[in-house]
Amino acid sequence: DGVEAIGIMTPSGDHYKIAKEFIKKNIHIICDKPLTSRVEDAKALEKLVKKTKIIFALTHNYSAYPMLREARELVTKNKIGKIKVINVEYPQGYTVAVKKKDEKSTLKWRLDKNMCGPSMILSEIGTHAYHLMRYVTGLEVKEVSAEVNSLSEEISVDDNAFIIVRMDNQARGSIWVS
């Protein structure tokens, strides 16, 4: 009897407006990461969802990988001891292949600040690294410092980030995404 749930797997710049419309219709949502390309939009969606009884699920595909589930289990069962240092590296190369002049690329939207937000590297790749760090360790980030920049003169979005974190158990961590 009608639509019960929808999946949002569009460019991240579209997530907010699509999700907002379906929240208003009380339809359950499965949304690909990142939730939105702007913090303000994410907070607005959270506020809207809290006024409903819908399920709003955000997907992080790598947490389903058996290797990561096993790593999480090792940490959870204290098989490797207390986590003191965390290092996550997630280098990518697709922005090298996608140039502004390449109008045919299906990834071109990732080079548009209006679609992916001010920092493509954090919203599109950093979100994977951040989620994996939290998923495997079970720890929460309490402090963060980052240097974010673009390594390419051909694109206008950030495509490189060095991130330093302090976790809730005082462990230190680093994330490099590029």
Predicted regions and their residues:
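Beta-loop-alpha module in the N-terminal Rossmann-like domain of NAD(P)-dependent dehydrogenases
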Residues: 1-48
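Short, Asp-centered acidic motifs that coordinate Mg2+ and/or phosphate
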Residues: 4-5, 85, 172
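A short helix->loop->beta-strand "cap" motif at the edges of active sites that frequently abuts
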Residues: 25-27, 52-54, 171
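Structural detector of well-ordered beta-strand residues that form the stable sheet scaffold
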Residues: 30, 55-57, 87, 110, ...
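Short strand-turn motif at the edge of the Rossmann-like AdoMet-binding core
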Residues: 33-34, 59-62, 90
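Rossmann-fold dehydrogenase core element
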Residues: 44-62, 82-86
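Predominantly a Rossmann-like dinucleotide-binding segment in NAD(P)-dependent oxidoreductases
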Residues: 63-147, 151-154
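NAD(P)-dinucleotide binding in Rossmann-like oxidoreductases
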Residues: 151-158, 168-178
